[in-house]
């Protein structure tokens, strides 16, 4: 059983940090039941993911897109753009009102009899 190292994968994904993110995403997919593209050989999911990347049986671009989708909390819609513009104008109005309000005296010196 040959050990896979980061050096085996760096020519496929030049940035080591990106490689770790992509391999972790693939390992999570394998844990979730995704089909393996290489023999497991009693390796754990992260090692299998690195071997798949090294042997180019999975495409890094697809893994990157899956990673981005998994990190998005809310998927953007076309209707959301209109709401954001309305929200920005409401926020600007609230900021204008706050800036125009008189400053409150928050010192405790006059009320404190110490």
Swiss-Prot record:
Protein name according to UniProt: DNA-directed RNA polymerase subunit omega
Q: Give a GO biological-process term.
A: DNA-templated transcription
Q: List GO terms (cellular component aspect).
A: DNA-directed RNA polymerase complex
Reactions catalysed, as given in the entry: RNA(n) + a ribonucleoside 5'-triphosphate = RNA(n+1) + diphosphate
Top-level EC class: transferase
Q: How does it assemble?
A: The RNAP catalytic core consists of 2 alpha, 1 beta, 1 beta' and 1 omega subunit. When a sigma factor is associated with the core the holoenzyme is formed, which can initiate transcription.
Instruction: Write out the function statement from the record.
Output: Promotes RNA polymerase assembly. Latches the N- and C-terminal regions of the beta' subunit thereby facilitating its interaction with the beta and alpha subunits.
The family note in this entry says:
Belongs to the RNA polymerase subunit omega family.
Sorted alphabetically, which NCBIfam families does this protein's record hold?
rpoZ
- Cross-referenced Pfam families, in alphabetical order? RNA_pol_Rpb6
Q: Which keywords, in A-to-Z order, does the entry hold?
A: DNA-directed RNA polymerase, Nucleotidyltransferase, Transcription, Transferase
- Tell me which EC number(s) this protein carries: 2.7.7.6
Query: InterPro entries of this UniProt entry?
Result: DNA-dir_RNA_pol_omega (IPR003716), Pol_omega/Rpo6/RPB6 (IPR006110), RPB6/omega-like_sf (IPR036161)
- Select a single GO molecular function from the record's annotations and give it: DNA binding
């Amino acid at each position: 059983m040959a050990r896979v190292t980061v050096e085996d994968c760096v020519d496929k994904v030049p940035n080591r940090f990106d490689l770790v993110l992509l391999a972790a995403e693939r390992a999570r997919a394998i844990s979730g039941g995704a089909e393996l593209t290489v023999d497991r050989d009693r390796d754990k999911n992260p090692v299998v993911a690195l071997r798949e990347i090294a042997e180019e049986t999975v495409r890094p671009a697809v893994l990157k897109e899956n990673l981005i989708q998994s990190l998005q909390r809310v998927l953007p819609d076309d209707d959301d753009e209109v709401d954001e513009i309305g929200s920005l104008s409401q926020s600007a109005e609230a900021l204008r009102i706050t800036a125009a309000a008189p400053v409150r005296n928050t010192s405790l010196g006059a009320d404190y009899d110490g």
